[in-house]
Curated annotation (Swiss-Prot):
<feature type="repeat" description="WD 3">
    <location>
        <begin position="83"/>
        <end position="122"/>
    </location>
</feature>
<keyword id="KW-0963">Cytoplasm</keyword>
<dbReference type="InterPro" id="IPR015943">
    <property type="entry name" value="WD40/YVTN_repeat-like_dom_sf"/>
</dbReference>
<dbReference type="GO" id="GO:0032956">
    <property type="term" value="P:regulation of actin cytoskeleton organization"/>
</dbReference>
<dbReference type="GO" id="GO:0005765">
    <property type="term" value="C:lysosomal membrane"/>
</dbReference>
<keyword id="KW-0677">Repeat</keyword>
<dbReference type="GO" id="GO:0031932">
    <property type="term" value="C:TORC2 complex"/>
</dbReference>
<feature type="repeat" description="WD 5">
    <location>
        <begin position="168"/>
        <end position="207"/>
    </location>
</feature>
<feature type="repeat" description="WD 6">
    <location>
        <begin position="218"/>
        <end position="257"/>
    </location>
</feature>
<keyword id="KW-0472">Membrane</keyword>
<dbReference type="GO" id="GO:0005737">
    <property type="term" value="C:cytoplasm"/>
</dbReference>
<dbReference type="GO" id="GO:0038203">
    <property type="term" value="P:TORC2 signaling"/>
</dbReference>
<dbReference type="InterPro" id="IPR011047">
    <property type="entry name" value="Quinoprotein_ADH-like_sf"/>
</dbReference>
<feature type="repeat" description="WD 4">
    <location>
        <begin position="126"/>
        <end position="165"/>
    </location>
</feature>
<dbReference type="InterPro" id="IPR019775">
    <property type="entry name" value="WD40_repeat_CS"/>
</dbReference>
<feature type="repeat" description="WD 2">
    <location>
        <begin position="40"/>
        <end position="80"/>
    </location>
</feature>
<dbReference type="GO" id="GO:0031929">
    <property type="term" value="P:TOR signaling"/>
</dbReference>
Amino acid sequence: MNSTQGTVGSDPVILATAGYDHTVRFWQAHSGICTRTVQHQDSQVNSLEVTPDRSMIAAAGYQHIRMYDLNSNNPNPVINYDGVSKNITSVGFHEDGRWMYTGGEDCMARIWDLRSRNLQCQRIFQVNAPINCVFLHPNQAELIVGDQSGAIHIWDLKTDQNEQLIPETDVSINSVHIDPDASYMAAVNSSGNCFVWNLTGGLGEDLTQLIPKTKIPAHKRCALKCKFSPDSTLLATCSADQTCKIWRTSNFSLMTELSIKSNNPGETSRGWMWDCAFSGDSQYIVTASSDNLARLWCVETGEIKREYSGHQKAVVCLAFNDSVLG
């Protein structure tokens, strides 16, 4: 290793993982080598997201969001957003980096203006149950919010109007995602079901309309995450059943099951599959699980290509960005 070691932000591939051991780790995706570890004091990390310009990473934890600089080796957060009373479960960014959105167990989704020197949130959307997940529609104008009561809220940021749907009453919505083409929305819940809708509208003044497409009994245990691939042809679902399943969006049939179940009869569960992210070419997927590992898999064959070992406790979230800015 030479003395002019590059920073995480200079690497064309950013892979970061975090969870219950109060650290965020950065990895060389191809080699499995941990290149940097930053401490995240006082709290587990629930969600990670890289800013659109790849200069910083946001870590959402208990009562705060911390921003770490990817273009230096500074081990401390460069910005702290506080003033939230409970766990922050979800974080993401507007595509041009103007603002950040979060959701949390205080039943609020928030918008934070990243250009403001005032580190207070600018807008709040209140619901009646703790929020597990928030995702920004590709039109950058609607926030999709999933809560523990089983409701999915569509918050129109232009008009401040909102609509809601409840695919399964009193079953917590744990993850929502929209594919890059804005053709489909998926949501997974604690009974292991995955719901898919066709999307129409969402342009100009029109609020997005959701037309039920299918319900997949994806897992027999709690489903924790759903993600569409960048090319919109695949949907991944992660679960407490120790699997991540890959579904074809052409007919929502199962293509591949990625399992961390042990073949040893005496070995108990290796834990939950918490999070996943596809590579930019949709050929690979990284998973985070509570056996302290992240793994890189080949989507087509289900083969493990790399393991990322170093966390001392469960890995519950990751950020994977292999897009090269033009």
